[in-house]
Amino acid sequence: HPIQNLFQPSLVLDM
């Protein structure tokens, strides 16, 4: 994934 799990796990999965 482009970004690490800095905010929400869902965000990372979406990206």
Swiss-Prot record:
Q: What GO molecular function terms would the record report?
A: retinal binding
Its Gene Ontology cellular component terms are:
extracellular region; interphotoreceptor matrix
- Where is it localised? Secreted, Extracellular space, Extracellular matrix, Interphotoreceptor matrix
Work out whether the entry's keyword set contains Secreted: yes
Alphabetized, the UniProt keywords read: Extracellular matrix, Secreted, Transport, Vitamin A
Q: Provide the function of this protein.
A: IRBP shuttles 11-cis and all trans retinoids between the retinol isomerase in the pigment epithelium and the visual pigments in the photoreceptor cells of the retina.
Q: What name has this protein been given in UniProt?
A: Retinol-binding protein 3
Give the species: Cricetidae sp.
